[in-house]
Amino acid sequence: MEQTWRWYGPNDPVSLADVRQAGATGVVTALHHIPNGEVWSVEEILKRKAIVEDAGLVWSVVESVPIHEDIKTHTGNYEQWIANYQQTLRNLAQCGIRTVCYNFMPVLDWTRTDLEYVLPDGSKALRFDQIEFAAFEMHILKRPGAEADYTEEEIAQAAVRFATMSDEDKARLTRNIIAGLPGAEEGYTLDQFRKHLELYKDIDKAKLRENFAVFLKAIIPVAEEVGVRMAVHPDDPPRPILGLPRIVSTIEDMQWMVDTVNSMANGFTMCTGSYGVRADNDLVDMIKQFGPRIYFTHLRSTMREDNPKTFHEAAHLNGDVDMYEVVKAIVEEEHRRKAEGKEDLIPMRPDHGHQMLDDLKKKTNPGYSAIGRLKGLAEVRGTGTGSGA
Protein backbone atom coordinates (compact mmCIF):
# COMPACT_ATOMS: atom_id res chain seq x y z
CA MET A 1 0.00 0.00 0.00
CA GLU A 2 1.16 3.49 -0.78
CA GLN A 3 1.11 5.47 2.47
CA THR A 4 -0.60 8.82 1.98
CA TRP A 5 -1.89 11.69 4.10
CA ARG A 6 -4.69 14.15 3.56
CA TRP A 7 -3.53 17.74 3.44
CA TYR A 8 -5.88 20.71 3.15
CA GLY A 9 -3.40 23.01 1.50
CA PRO A 10 -1.25 25.88 2.76
CA ASN A 11 -3.70 26.77 5.55
CA ASP A 12 -3.68 23.26 7.04
CA PRO A 13 -2.31 23.33 10.62
CA VAL A 14 -0.43 20.12 9.75
CA SER A 15 2.50 21.02 7.51
CA LEU A 16 3.96 18.99 4.67
CA ALA A 17 7.11 18.63 6.77
CA ASP A 18 4.93 16.99 9.42
CA VAL A 19 3.44 14.70 6.78
CA ARG A 20 6.87 13.56 5.62
CA GLN A 21 8.04 12.96 9.18
CA ALA A 22 4.95 10.80 9.77
CA GLY A 23 6.28 8.39 7.15
CA ALA A 24 3.83 9.12 4.36
CA THR A 25 5.18 9.42 0.84
CA GLY A 26 2.05 10.61 -0.93
CA VAL A 27 -0.28 13.55 -0.39
CA VAL A 28 -4.03 13.59 -0.85
CA THR A 29 -5.21 17.12 -1.50
CA ALA A 30 -7.51 19.34 -3.56
CA LEU A 31 -7.82 22.92 -4.76
CA HIS A 32 -10.34 23.98 -2.14
CA HIS A 33 -10.00 27.64 -3.06
CA ILE A 34 -11.62 27.09 -6.47
CA PRO A 35 -15.43 27.41 -6.32
CA ASN A 36 -17.52 24.30 -6.92
CA GLY A 37 -17.99 23.63 -10.60
CA GLU A 38 -15.21 25.86 -11.88
CA VAL A 39 -12.41 24.36 -13.99
CA TRP A 40 -9.13 23.59 -12.25
CA SER A 41 -6.60 25.17 -14.57
CA VAL A 42 -3.29 23.53 -15.41
CA GLU A 43 -1.56 26.52 -13.84
CA GLU A 44 -3.34 26.09 -10.48
CA ILE A 45 -2.80 22.32 -10.47
CA LEU A 46 0.92 22.73 -11.17
CA LYS A 47 1.24 25.33 -8.39
CA ARG A 48 -0.11 22.87 -5.84
CA LYS A 49 1.90 19.98 -7.29
CA ALA A 50 5.10 22.02 -6.99
CA ILE A 51 4.41 22.81 -3.33
CA VAL A 52 3.94 19.11 -2.60
CA GLU A 53 7.02 18.01 -4.54
CA ASP A 54 9.21 20.72 -3.03
CA ALA A 55 8.47 19.07 0.33
CA GLY A 56 9.82 15.75 -0.95
CA LEU A 57 6.38 14.19 -1.46
CA VAL A 58 4.13 13.35 -4.41
CA TRP A 59 0.53 14.35 -5.07
CA SER A 60 -0.97 10.87 -5.24
CA VAL A 61 -4.74 11.41 -5.09
CA VAL A 62 -7.16 14.28 -5.60
CA GLU A 63 -9.76 14.38 -2.86
CA SER A 64 -12.04 15.69 -4.08
CA VAL A 65 -13.11 17.31 -7.31
CA PRO A 66 -16.52 18.37 -5.97
CA ILE A 67 -19.67 17.88 -8.01
CA HIS A 68 -21.93 20.91 -8.37
CA GLU A 69 -25.40 20.52 -6.86
CA ASP A 70 -26.98 21.30 -10.26
CA ILE A 71 -25.53 18.03 -11.55
CA LYS A 72 -27.05 16.09 -8.67
CA THR A 73 -30.47 17.67 -9.19
CA HIS A 74 -30.17 17.70 -13.00
CA THR A 75 -31.19 21.36 -13.09
CA GLY A 76 -29.76 24.77 -13.95
CA ASN A 77 -26.41 24.79 -15.71
CA TYR A 78 -25.68 21.11 -15.10
CA GLU A 79 -24.41 20.58 -18.66
CA GLN A 80 -21.84 23.36 -18.25
CA TRP A 81 -20.76 22.01 -14.86
CA ILE A 82 -20.27 18.56 -16.40
CA ALA A 83 -18.21 20.06 -19.23
CA ASN A 84 -16.10 21.89 -16.64
CA TYR A 85 -15.59 18.64 -14.73
CA GLN A 86 -14.45 16.89 -17.90
CA GLN A 87 -11.92 19.64 -18.53
CA THR A 88 -10.62 19.43 -14.96
CA LEU A 89 -9.97 15.71 -15.46
CA ARG A 90 -8.08 16.43 -18.67
CA ASN A 91 -6.00 19.06 -16.90
CA LEU A 92 -5.21 16.77 -13.97
CA ALA A 93 -4.10 14.04 -16.36
CA GLN A 94 -1.92 16.51 -18.24
CA CYS A 95 -0.22 17.27 -14.91
CA GLY A 96 0.31 13.57 -14.15
CA ILE A 97 -2.35 13.23 -11.43
CA ARG A 98 -4.54 10.27 -12.26
CA THR A 99 -6.56 9.18 -9.21
CA VAL A 100 -9.62 11.22 -8.29
CA CYS A 101 -11.80 10.61 -5.25
CA TYR A 102 -15.27 12.17 -5.35
CA ASN A 103 -18.74 11.66 -3.89
CA PHE A 104 -22.36 12.03 -4.95
CA MET A 105 -23.91 12.88 -1.57
CA PRO A 106 -26.71 15.44 -1.92
CA VAL A 107 -26.47 18.75 0.00
CA LEU A 108 -24.24 17.49 2.82
CA ASP A 109 -20.91 15.76 2.70
CA TRP A 110 -19.94 13.65 5.72
CA THR A 111 -21.98 14.40 8.84
CA ARG A 112 -21.37 14.25 12.59
CA THR A 113 -23.22 15.64 15.61
CA ASP A 114 -20.29 15.83 18.06
CA LEU A 115 -16.80 16.91 17.07
CA GLU A 116 -15.32 16.60 20.58
CA TYR A 117 -16.62 13.31 21.96
CA VAL A 118 -14.41 12.49 24.94
CA LEU A 119 -13.22 8.89 25.09
CA PRO A 120 -12.36 7.08 28.36
CA ASP A 121 -8.63 7.79 27.88
CA GLY A 122 -9.25 11.54 27.50
CA SER A 123 -8.68 11.75 23.76
CA LYS A 124 -11.44 13.14 21.55
CA ALA A 125 -13.27 11.55 18.64
CA LEU A 126 -16.06 12.36 16.20
CA ARG A 127 -19.52 10.95 16.88
CA PHE A 128 -22.89 10.65 15.18
CA ASP A 129 -25.71 10.51 17.73
CA GLN A 130 -28.96 9.34 16.16
CA ILE A 131 -31.07 10.98 18.90
CA GLU A 132 -29.27 14.33 18.69
CA PHE A 133 -29.62 14.25 14.92
CA ALA A 134 -33.34 13.54 15.31
CA ALA A 135 -33.63 16.44 17.76
CA PHE A 136 -31.96 18.72 15.22
CA GLU A 137 -34.11 17.55 12.35
CA MET A 138 -37.46 17.67 14.13
CA HIS A 139 -37.04 20.55 16.60
CA ILE A 140 -34.39 22.89 15.15
CA LEU A 141 -34.61 22.37 11.41
CA LYS A 142 -38.30 21.41 11.72
CA ARG A 143 -38.25 19.43 8.48
CA PRO A 144 -41.80 18.49 7.45
CA GLY A 145 -42.36 14.75 7.66
CA ALA A 146 -39.13 14.08 9.54
CA GLU A 147 -40.95 11.97 12.13
CA ALA A 148 -41.55 9.27 9.52
CA ASP A 149 -37.81 8.48 9.52
CA TYR A 150 -37.66 7.64 13.23
CA THR A 151 -39.15 5.09 15.59
CA GLU A 152 -41.61 6.17 18.27
CA GLU A 153 -38.91 5.58 20.87
CA GLU A 154 -36.42 7.77 18.98
CA ILE A 155 -39.02 10.53 18.60
CA ALA A 156 -39.68 10.51 22.35
CA GLN A 157 -35.96 10.44 23.19
CA ALA A 158 -35.28 13.31 20.78
CA ALA A 159 -37.97 15.44 22.43
CA VAL A 160 -36.42 14.85 25.84
CA ARG A 161 -32.92 15.57 24.51
CA PHE A 162 -34.05 18.80 22.86
CA ALA A 163 -35.76 19.97 26.05
CA THR A 164 -32.47 19.66 27.96
CA MET A 165 -30.38 21.58 25.39
CA SER A 166 -29.15 25.07 26.14
CA ASP A 167 -29.12 27.70 23.40
CA GLU A 168 -25.40 27.07 23.00
CA ASP A 169 -25.99 23.33 22.70
CA LYS A 170 -28.50 23.96 19.91
CA ALA A 171 -26.18 26.38 18.13
CA ARG A 172 -23.22 23.99 18.36
CA LEU A 173 -25.26 21.04 17.08
CA THR A 174 -26.52 23.13 14.17
CA ARG A 175 -22.99 24.28 13.31
CA ASN A 176 -21.64 20.74 13.46
CA ILE A 177 -24.24 19.46 11.03
CA ILE A 178 -24.62 22.23 8.45
CA ALA A 179 -21.60 24.52 8.64
CA GLY A 180 -19.34 22.16 6.69
CA LEU A 181 -16.72 19.72 7.98
CA PRO A 182 -13.18 19.42 6.55
CA GLY A 183 -13.32 18.48 2.89
CA ALA A 184 -16.91 19.63 2.50
CA GLU A 185 -17.12 22.41 -0.04
CA GLU A 186 -20.47 23.78 1.11
CA GLY A 187 -21.56 25.33 4.40
CA TYR A 188 -25.03 26.70 5.07
CA THR A 189 -27.11 28.87 7.32
CA LEU A 190 -30.29 27.22 8.58
CA ASP A 191 -32.46 29.04 6.02
CA GLN A 192 -30.07 28.22 3.17
CA PHE A 193 -30.08 24.61 4.29
CA ARG A 194 -33.87 24.41 4.18
CA LYS A 195 -33.87 25.85 0.66
CA HIS A 196 -31.30 23.32 -0.53
CA LEU A 197 -33.29 20.44 0.93
CA GLU A 198 -36.36 21.74 -0.90
CA LEU A 199 -34.53 21.26 -4.21
CA TYR A 200 -34.61 17.50 -3.55
CA LYS A 201 -38.28 17.20 -2.60
CA ASP A 202 -39.08 15.33 -5.84
CA ILE A 203 -35.80 13.37 -6.03
CA ASP A 204 -35.96 9.83 -4.67
CA LYS A 205 -33.31 7.11 -4.87
CA ALA A 206 -34.28 6.13 -8.43
CA LYS A 207 -34.15 9.73 -9.64
CA LEU A 208 -30.82 10.45 -7.94
CA ARG A 209 -29.41 7.30 -9.55
CA GLU A 210 -30.70 8.53 -12.89
CA ASN A 211 -28.89 11.84 -12.38
CA PHE A 212 -25.74 10.03 -11.25
CA ALA A 213 -25.90 7.87 -14.39
CA VAL A 214 -25.96 11.02 -16.55
CA PHE A 215 -22.81 12.20 -14.78
CA LEU A 216 -21.04 8.84 -15.04
CA LYS A 217 -21.84 8.42 -18.73
CA ALA A 218 -20.37 11.86 -19.42
CA ILE A 219 -17.34 11.67 -17.14
CA ILE A 220 -16.08 8.09 -17.25
CA PRO A 221 -15.33 8.04 -21.01
CA VAL A 222 -13.20 11.17 -20.57
CA ALA A 223 -11.43 9.62 -17.57
CA GLU A 224 -10.77 6.48 -19.60
CA GLU A 225 -9.47 8.52 -22.53
CA VAL A 226 -6.93 10.45 -20.44
CA GLY A 227 -5.99 7.65 -18.03
CA VAL A 228 -7.69 8.93 -14.88
CA ARG A 229 -9.17 6.50 -12.36
CA MET A 230 -12.35 7.74 -10.69
CA ALA A 231 -12.86 6.45 -7.14
CA VAL A 232 -16.28 7.23 -5.69
CA HIS A 233 -16.42 7.71 -1.92
CA PRO A 234 -19.32 6.09 -0.05
CA ASP A 235 -22.05 8.00 1.73
CA ASP A 236 -21.24 8.96 5.30
CA PRO A 237 -23.25 7.79 7.14
CA PRO A 238 -24.28 5.19 4.54
CA ARG A 239 -28.04 5.58 4.74
CA PRO A 240 -30.69 8.18 3.86
CA ILE A 241 -30.72 11.24 6.11
CA LEU A 242 -32.83 14.42 6.18
CA GLY A 243 -35.20 12.90 3.65
CA LEU A 244 -32.34 12.75 1.14
CA PRO A 245 -31.61 9.57 -0.80
CA ARG A 246 -28.18 7.96 -0.60
CA ILE A 247 -26.94 5.82 -3.47
CA VAL A 248 -23.36 4.77 -2.61
CA SER A 249 -23.91 2.86 0.62
CA THR A 250 -23.94 -0.89 -0.08
CA ILE A 251 -22.45 -3.61 -2.27
CA GLU A 252 -25.63 -3.46 -4.33
CA ASP A 253 -24.93 0.22 -5.02
CA MET A 254 -21.40 -0.68 -6.11
CA GLN A 255 -22.75 -3.27 -8.52
CA TRP A 256 -25.24 -0.74 -9.91
CA MET A 257 -22.37 1.62 -10.71
CA VAL A 258 -20.44 -1.06 -12.56
CA ASP A 259 -23.53 -2.16 -14.47
CA THR A 260 -24.31 1.46 -15.40
CA VAL A 261 -20.87 2.23 -16.85
CA ASN A 262 -18.69 -0.86 -17.16
CA SER A 263 -15.31 0.79 -17.49
CA MET A 264 -12.20 0.23 -15.41
CA ALA A 265 -12.04 4.01 -15.02
CA ASN A 266 -15.23 3.70 -12.94
CA GLY A 267 -13.93 2.67 -9.54
CA PHE A 268 -14.20 2.99 -5.79
CA THR A 269 -12.69 4.46 -2.66
CA MET A 270 -12.88 1.80 0.03
CA CYS A 271 -13.65 3.92 3.08
CA THR A 272 -13.97 1.41 5.88
CA GLY A 273 -15.19 4.05 8.31
CA SER A 274 -18.15 4.87 6.08
CA TYR A 275 -19.18 1.48 4.72
CA GLY A 276 -18.40 -0.07 8.11
CA VAL A 277 -21.11 1.90 9.92
CA ARG A 278 -23.64 -0.54 8.46
CA ALA A 279 -23.59 -3.96 10.10
CA ASP A 280 -24.89 -5.51 6.87
CA ASN A 281 -21.85 -4.37 4.86
CA ASP A 282 -19.23 -7.12 4.56
CA LEU A 283 -16.14 -5.04 3.83
CA VAL A 284 -13.87 -7.96 2.99
CA ASP A 285 -16.43 -9.31 0.53
CA MET A 286 -16.69 -5.85 -1.06
CA ILE A 287 -12.92 -5.76 -1.53
CA LYS A 288 -12.83 -9.27 -2.98
CA GLN A 289 -15.69 -8.60 -5.40
CA PHE A 290 -14.55 -5.18 -6.58
CA GLY A 291 -10.81 -5.32 -5.82
CA PRO A 292 -9.63 -4.52 -9.36
CA ARG A 293 -11.66 -1.29 -9.21
CA ILE A 294 -10.49 -0.14 -5.77
CA TYR A 295 -8.13 2.75 -6.43
CA PHE A 296 -7.96 4.40 -3.01
CA THR A 297 -8.56 3.40 0.61
CA HIS A 298 -9.50 5.28 3.77
CA LEU A 299 -8.71 3.04 6.72
CA ARG A 300 -10.40 3.70 10.05
CA SER A 301 -12.95 2.03 12.28
CA THR A 302 -16.21 2.99 13.94
CA MET A 303 -18.07 1.60 16.93
CA ARG A 304 -21.83 1.23 16.85
CA GLU A 305 -23.52 1.99 20.17
CA ASP A 306 -26.76 0.82 21.86
CA ASN A 307 -28.79 2.52 19.16
CA PRO A 308 -27.12 0.90 16.12
CA LYS A 309 -27.49 4.14 14.15
CA THR A 310 -25.36 5.95 16.72
CA PHE A 311 -21.61 5.48 16.32
CA HIS A 312 -18.32 7.04 17.23
CA GLU A 313 -14.96 6.83 15.53
CA ALA A 314 -12.89 4.18 17.27
CA ALA A 315 -9.13 3.68 17.22
CA HIS A 316 -7.91 2.51 13.83
CA LEU A 317 -7.45 -1.13 14.84
CA ASN A 318 -10.45 -1.30 17.19
CA GLY A 319 -14.17 -0.93 16.68
CA ASP A 320 -16.51 -2.85 14.41
CA VAL A 321 -14.15 -3.04 11.42
CA ASP A 322 -11.87 -6.09 11.30
CA MET A 323 -8.91 -4.04 10.12
CA TYR A 324 -6.55 -7.00 9.87
CA GLU A 325 -8.83 -8.85 7.44
CA VAL A 326 -9.53 -5.65 5.50
CA VAL A 327 -5.83 -4.83 5.10
CA LYS A 328 -5.07 -8.45 4.25
CA ALA A 329 -7.68 -8.36 1.46
CA ILE A 330 -6.22 -5.11 0.10
CA VAL A 331 -2.69 -6.54 0.16
CA GLU A 332 -3.91 -9.68 -1.62
CA GLU A 333 -5.42 -7.48 -4.33
CA GLU A 334 -2.08 -5.71 -4.73
CA HIS A 335 -0.32 -9.07 -5.06
CA ARG A 336 -2.84 -10.10 -7.72
CA ARG A 337 -2.07 -6.94 -9.67
CA LYS A 338 1.67 -7.52 -9.42
CA ALA A 339 1.21 -11.07 -10.72
CA GLU A 340 -0.44 -9.53 -13.79
CA GLY A 341 2.53 -7.23 -14.30
CA LYS A 342 0.90 -4.14 -12.83
CA GLU A 343 2.82 -1.96 -10.42
CA ASP A 344 0.03 0.28 -9.18
CA LEU A 345 -0.02 0.25 -5.39
CA ILE A 346 -3.31 1.21 -3.76
CA PRO A 347 -2.96 4.57 -2.00
CA MET A 348 -4.01 4.30 1.64
CA ARG A 349 -4.51 7.09 4.10
CA PRO A 350 -5.23 6.78 7.80
CA ASP A 351 -8.63 8.39 7.96
CA HIS A 352 -9.81 10.50 10.88
CA GLY A 353 -7.60 10.23 13.93
CA HIS A 354 -8.36 10.96 17.56
CA GLN A 355 -7.37 14.35 18.92
CA MET A 356 -4.85 13.42 21.58
CA LEU A 357 -1.70 14.39 23.50
CA ASP A 358 -0.37 17.81 22.52
CA ASP A 359 -3.04 18.23 19.82
CA LEU A 360 -5.65 18.63 22.57
CA LYS A 361 -4.14 22.08 23.17
CA LYS A 362 -4.16 23.09 19.50
CA LYS A 363 -6.69 24.26 16.96
CA THR A 364 -7.18 21.36 14.56
CA ASN A 365 -9.47 20.36 11.71
CA PRO A 366 -12.04 17.92 13.16
CA GLY A 367 -10.81 14.40 12.53
CA TYR A 368 -7.57 15.62 10.99
CA SER A 369 -5.22 16.35 13.87
CA ALA A 370 -1.66 15.13 13.37
CA ILE A 371 -0.88 12.82 16.26
CA GLY A 372 -3.98 10.64 16.04
CA ARG A 373 -3.37 10.07 12.34
CA LEU A 374 0.34 9.48 12.96
CA LYS A 375 -0.68 6.72 15.37
CA GLY A 376 -3.20 5.35 12.89
CA LEU A 377 -0.70 5.35 10.03
CA ALA A 378 1.85 3.46 12.13
CA GLU A 379 -0.76 0.90 13.18
CA VAL A 380 -2.05 0.33 9.67
CA ARG A 381 1.50 0.18 8.31
CA GLY A 382 2.30 -2.53 10.82
CA THR A 383 -0.89 -4.39 9.99
CA GLY A 384 0.05 -4.31 6.33
CA THR A 385 3.50 -5.67 7.07
CA GLY A 386 2.04 -8.43 9.20
CA SER A 387 -0.39 -9.40 6.46
CA GLY A 388 2.29 -9.74 3.81
CA ALA A 389 2.64 -6.29 2.26
UniProtKB/Swiss-Prot annotation:
MF terms (GO), sorted A to Z: ferrous iron binding; manganese ion binding; mannonate dehydratase activity
EC top class named in words: lyase
Pathway listed: Carbohydrate metabolism; pentose and glucuronate interconversion
Cofactor(s) it depends on: Fe(2+); Mn(2+)
InterPro entries cross-referenced by the UniProt entry: Man_deHydtase, Xyl_isomerase-like_sf
Keyword Cytoplasm: no
Keywords (A to Z) from UniProt: Iron, Lyase, Manganese
E.C. code: 4.2.1.8
Annotated GO biological process: D-glucuronate catabolic process
Catalytic activity, as annotated: D-mannonate = 2-dehydro-3-deoxy-D-gluconate + H2O
Translocase as UniProt keyword: no
UniProt function note: Catalyzes the dehydration of D-mannonate.
Similarity field: Belongs to the mannonate dehydratase family.
Name by which UniProt lists this protein: Mannonate dehydratase
Native source species: Escherichia coli (strain ATCC 8739 / DSM 1576 / NBRC 3972 / NCIMB 8545 / WDCM 00012 / Crooks)
Higher taxonomy: Bacteria, Pseudomonadati, Pseudomonadota, Gammaproteobacteria, Enterobacterales
Gene that encodes it: uxuA
